[in-house]
């Protein structure tokens, strides 16, 4: 695609809303609260914020700067940074290709639950076998996934300004208002258990926020750092081509550093509010042992919590799943856009052709994922010890292998091959100040690659702490 014809976000607000929409996804809602509750509440939040300002800032800045400098999507951008590294673009582009089918499948699950709360099926949705019965059915999951994919495809088909930007500007403020509203309500509830124990939302807030360092070992602290880094890494949409694609649509006169700071604040605030919304509510009705992660939290634990609230729980549940739908679709739009922009730039296709090709691929991929829970069901032991089906295998490959690998290689490319000045010059091209320049240089050259390598080792089931302990025995 000709660079002169390339679409643009209209300004800073459009870019920030779109990038924040990508970053604020299911990971913020179903993983952040669980990790915060598991990892001593305030300890996890403190570590997460520190990493967001250092590690996350470095990776986010790198991806966005590469995109704006080259004015290309992920498939071709890295080759323009350094000819011998164009293969890295292909590696980065594979990530959204793997993610899109299973993300839209999960989006279909969210739509199913939202529909249940609007059609009077709230009692049924709390049943122990409801979720399993739905995902193992041969037709319903496909129908809901297709609806979700269609909505995603329409937004991407409409383009950057009239599609992605316009959509994000409308949905993101609504999403934030819903999260704030539900969070406030979560703090007001209380419940008396069968044993007479009274738990309140404020008690849950204390569990969420107050750090407890008592009895924490080096291993415990290390695992909190790994959990926080893993969550942040997946949350800000780096190393998967998305921020490179979005960066390529940013006008040259936009203050990149200011925009990146706003994206950081937005994503961290929403992640924090997600915890504020979920942890107190689950604690009130189920205690700390009621917290789980992933689909178990969203589709099993939370419906039971909403049901325990009584009639008001139906309203809260409906609002919650509307909010989750918005979060899921803004993220799926960004995943599809990373694929589409790559096709447009590499093969000089029109947006419409690229969007149609990507949608057709996603339909085939979704069928494979959905059938993985029934006619093609299997259980595979992963290197990290988890038992996986098709969706889990795709998630493991994209999130645990390819993304850390792409991020490590990006750090090597910028930190050692073309030097950090490449990114710094792009960020400061209009005379803007690079507020954390020295930090960025140290992080991209040394700290980030080491942390990412540890994250990658953990994905292969390698216990770094135990490994170091054995060395010094």
Regions found by a protein language model. Name each.
Residues 3-6, 34-39, 72-91, 104-163, ...:
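Inter-helical loop and helix-membrane interface segments of multi-pass membrane transporters/permeases
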Residues 1-30, 59-64, 68-80, 86-87, ...:
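Membrane-interface "cap" regions at the ends of multi-pass membrane proteins
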Residues 35, 39, 65, 80-81, ...:
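Membrane-water interface regions at transmembrane-helix termini and the short interhelical loops
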């Amino acid at each position: 695609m000709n660079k002169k014809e390339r679409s643009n976000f209209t300004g800073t607000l459009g870019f920030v809303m779109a990038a924040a929409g990508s970053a604020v996804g299911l990971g913020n809602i179903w993983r952040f609260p669980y990790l915060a509750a598991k990892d001593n509440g305030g300890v996890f939040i403190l570590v997460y914020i520190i990493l967001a300002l250092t590690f996350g800032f470095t990776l986010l800045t790198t991806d966005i700067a590469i995109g704006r400098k080259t004015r290309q999507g992920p498939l071709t951008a890295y080759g323009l940074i350094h000819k011998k590294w164009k293969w890295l673009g292909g590696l980065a582009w594979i990530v959204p290709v793997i993610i899109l089918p299973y993300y839209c499948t999960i989006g279909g699950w969210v739509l199913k639950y939202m529909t249940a709360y609007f059609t009077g099926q709230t009692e049924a949705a709390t049943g122990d076998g409801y979720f399993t019965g739905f995902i193992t059915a041969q037709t319903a999951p496909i129908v809901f996934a297709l609806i979700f994919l269609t909505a995603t495809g329409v937004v991407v088909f409409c383009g950057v300004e009239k599609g992605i930007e316009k959509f994000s500007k409308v949905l993101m403020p609504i999403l934030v208002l819903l999260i704030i509203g539900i969070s406030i309500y979560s703090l007001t509830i209380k419940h008396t258990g069968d044993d007479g124990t009274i738990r309140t939302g404020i008690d849950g807030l204390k569990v969420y926020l107050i750090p407890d360092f008592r009895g924490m070992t080096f291993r415990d602290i290390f695992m909190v750092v790994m959990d926080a880094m893993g969550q942040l890494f997946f949350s800000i949409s780096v190393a998967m081509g998305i921020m490179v694609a979005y960066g390529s649509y940013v006008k040259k006169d936009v203050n990149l550093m200011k925009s990146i700071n706003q994206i950081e604040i937005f994503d961290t605030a929403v992640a924090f509010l997600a915890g504020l919304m979920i942890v107190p509510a689950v604690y009130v009705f189920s205690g700390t042992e009621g917290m789980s992660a992933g689909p178990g939290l969203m589709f099993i634990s939370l419906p039971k919590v909403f049901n325990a609230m009584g009639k008001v729980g139906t309203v809260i549940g409906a609002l919650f799943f509307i909010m989750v739908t918005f979060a899921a679709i803004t993220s799926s739009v960004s995943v599809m856009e990373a694929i589409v922009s790559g096709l447009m730039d590499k093969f000089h296709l029109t947006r419409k052709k690229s969007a149609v090709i990507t949608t057709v691929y996603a339909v085939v991929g979704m069928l494979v994922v959905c059938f993985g829970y029934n006619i093609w069901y299997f259980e595979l032991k992963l290197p990290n010890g988890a038992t996986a089906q098709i969706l889990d295998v795709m998630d493991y490959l994209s999130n645990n292998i390819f993304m850390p690998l792409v991020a490590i290689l990006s750090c090597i490319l910028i930190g050692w091959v073309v030097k950090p000045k490449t990114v710094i010059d792009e960020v400061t091209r209009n005379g803007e100040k690079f507020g954390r320049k020295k930090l960025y240089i140290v992080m991209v050259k040394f700290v980030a690659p080491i942390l990412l390598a540890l994250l990658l080792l953990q994905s292969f089931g390698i216990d770094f702490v135990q490994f170091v302990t054995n060395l010094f025995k």
